[in-house]
Amino acid sequence: MIERGTLTFRDAGPDDAEWIAGLLSDEGYPAGATDIRRRLERYVERECPVRVAEAGGERVGFVACQVIPRFEHNDQVVRVMALVVDPGVRGRGVGGALMAEAEKIADGIDAAFLEVTAGHHRPGARRLFEAAGYDASLTTYLRKRR
């Protein structure tokens, strides 16, 4: 277990692009460093945080959040769009710490709620989110592929 107090968090930057691309590619979401740099720029422009977790100066995971203003209410929602932990440290508390970081982001903007999308093909991720109190029985939107 990596102690939560030993993890530090910082905003992702262009120097993280190749590392993030590698993690995403390993998870079945192929991306190059150039793609990730563009995505990071887009997230910064929209004030959507991407945070990197480090332990002992080494990057161990990241979480990318979208801040979404709701039209039907005068508030915002935070959605976790991506959360990936380095395979070498999985099962040691990093994912939970990254979710806690996402919750701090949501608290910081007084978000109405925090939501996360977790595919059925990622049972470990679903268990992480459910253990953190997320309700897996909700279906909040429908999707049509374009």
Task: Label every PLM stretch briefly.
Residues 68, 81, 86, 90, ...:
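Residue-level recognition of the GNAT/N-acetyltransferase active site
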Residues 85, 91-104, 127, 131:
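Conserved acetyl-CoA-binding loop-helix of GNAT-fold acetyltransferases
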Residues 5-7, 11-18, 22-75, 81, ...:
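Acetyl-CoA-dependent GNAT
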Residues 16-19, 97-98, 124:
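Charged catalytic carboxylate motif
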Residues 96, 120-138, 143-144:
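Conserved active-site alpha-helix within GNAT-family acetyltransferase domains
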Residues 99, 106-118:
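Conserved GNAT acetyl-CoA-binding A-motif
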